Amino acid sequence: MSQERPTFYRQELNKTIWEVPERYQNLSPVGSGAYGSVCAAFDTKTGLRVAVKKLSRPFQSIIHAKRTYRELRLLKHMKHENVIGLLDVFTPARSLEEFNDVYLVTHLMGADLNNIVKCQKLTDDHVQFLIYQILRGLKYIHSADIIHRDLKPSNLAVNEDCELKILDFGLARHTDDEMTGYVATRWYRAPEIMLNWMHYNQTVDIWSVGCIMAELLTGRTLFPGTDHIDQLKLILRLVGTPGAELLKKISSESARNYIQSLTQMPKMNFANVFIGANPLAVDLLEKMLVLDSDKRITAAQALAHAYFAQYHDPDDEPVADPYDQSFESRDLLIDEWKSLTYDEVISFVPPPLDQEEMES
């Protein structure tokens, strides 16, 4: 929120009261989830179409309050072309005492990668450009020591020019319930995170990129498991059962015992699975879809892969400023998280306006 308090107006949409600054007009609901509802709006100040998200019960519990603080801190930190950033954050409250609602404003993104894949099988050049942008955004996110954890086609927004932004990063802390059954939430998940094998690292996101890339190349979900076990079987059928070296790294004894009970399977020849694909694409997939996360390619390494020769520019693949997430280990009361969040709202400085965007 800027220092001059704007004039707010109230309106009811889908049984929710929205109280927003006058600059945001023509609010229309576009969706709602567990953590809030989203309206499309027209920003009269910039001429941009924006998404306004009203967080639902942001301070109802310590978990909610910490999540609210986390989301705001993350969005404020992200300043990269391939990562969703914050255009504005506001509250109708005039003081900390009456602070109960948080609204976040981001670019309104038309389609997501799901819509794109459903409509058409993509050319190899499209796949190069889309995956290059995902990796460019991931290099930035990972450099801040943030793990997305939930990369999937519906979390990748794409506009008419095929320009891509990563959404909803670093927030995902999925419940077992949301991961159960025939659900996309799990199809793109690295095995070590899905099955709690071990402490995971940033390359869980690279596994997801491999799954997404395979889907763009073939038009089919790579591992559409019906449950955790079926999912693991589909994965192992392609990449082979773990060898002794990886088994040693799996800290969960039950997971180790289960894997050892399975019939040994060799890794398939990816060229026979992705018939007709660019051999460089197949080579990159083999480096991403590696069971041992220590041996998986990183985002920075993948950007330098020959598959992206026409897009790779080492001078234009920026890293993030350091991101202080020491708050993650803090145990605070609701009012303390709320006060920290209020400070973040008040201190927000809007990004400089991008001329190109305003003209488009």
UniProtKB/Swiss-Prot annotation:
Leading EC class: transferase
Q: Which sequence positions carry the modification called Phosphothreonine?
A: 16, 180, 263
| Listed EC numbers | 2.7.11.24
**UniProt note on tissues of expression:** Brain, heart, placenta, pancreas and skeletal muscle. Expressed to a lesser extent in lung, liver and kidney.
Pfam families, from UniProt? Pkinase
In this UniProt entry, the residues modified to Phosphoserine are: 2
Q: What are the record keywords, sorted? A: Acetylation, Apoptosis, ATP-binding, Cytoplasm, Kinase, Nucleotide-binding, Nucleus, Phosphoprotein, Serine/threonine-protein kinase, Stress response, Transcription, Transcription regulation, Transferase, Ubl conjugation
* Catalytic machinery residues: 168 (proton acceptor)
List-wise, which residues carry N-acetylserine? 2
Outcome of substituting residue 175 to A: No effect on either the kinase activity or tyrosine phosphorylation
Name where it mostly resides.
cytoplasm
Summarize what the UniProt record says about post-translational modification: Dually phosphorylated on Thr-180 and Tyr-182 by the MAP2Ks MAP2K3/MKK3, MAP2K4/MKK4 and MAP2K6/MKK6 in response to inflammatory citokines, environmental stress or growth factors, which activates the enzyme. Dual phosphorylation can also be mediated by TAB1-mediated autophosphorylation. TCR engagement in T-cells also leads to Tyr-323 phosphorylation by ZAP70. Dephosphorylated and inactivated by DUPS1, DUSP10 and DUSP16. PPM1D also mediates dephosphorylation and inactivation of MAPK14. Acetylated at Lys-53 and Lys-152 by KAT2B and EP300. Acetylation at Lys-53 increases the affinity for ATP and enhances kinase activity. Lys-53 and Lys-152 are deacetylated by HDAC3.
The PTM N6-acetyllysine maps to 53, 152
Catalysed reactions listed for this entry = L-seryl-[protein] + ATP = O-phospho-L-seryl-[protein] + ADP + H(+); L-threonyl-[protein] + ATP = O-phospho-L-threonyl-[protein] + ADP + H(+)
Consequence of changing residue 180 to E? Loss of kinase activity
PANTHER family named in the record: MITOGEN-ACTIVATED PROTEIN KINASE
Quaternary state and interactors: Component of a signaling complex containing at least AKAP13, PKN1, MAPK14, ZAK and MAP2K3. Within this complex, AKAP13 interacts directly with PKN1, which in turn recruits MAPK14, MAP2K3 and ZAK. Binds to a kinase interaction motif within the protein tyrosine phosphatase, PTPRR. This interaction retains MAPK14 in the cytoplasm and prevents nuclear accumulation. Interacts with SPAG9 and GADD45A. Interacts with CDC25B, CDC25C, DUSP1, DUSP10, DUSP16, NP60, SUPT20H and TAB1. Interacts with casein kinase II subunits CSNK2A1 and CSNK2B. Interacts with PPM1D.
Q: What does this protein do?
A: Serine/threonine kinase which acts as an essential component of the MAP kinase signal transduction pathway. MAPK14 is one of the four p38 MAPKs which play an important role in the cascades of cellular responses evoked by extracellular stimuli such as pro-inflammatory cytokines or physical stress leading to direct activation of transcription factors. Accordingly, p38 MAPKs phosphorylate a broad range of proteins and it has been estimated that they may have approximately 200 to 300 substrates each.
Q: What is known of its domains?
A: The TXY motif contains the threonine and tyrosine residues whose phosphorylation activates the MAP kinases.
User: What name appears for this protein in its UniProt entry?
Assistant: Mitogen-activated protein kinase 14
Q: Which organism is it from?
A: Homo sapiens
Starting at the broadest rank, the lineage of the source organism is: Eukaryota, Metazoa, Chordata, Craniata, Vertebrata
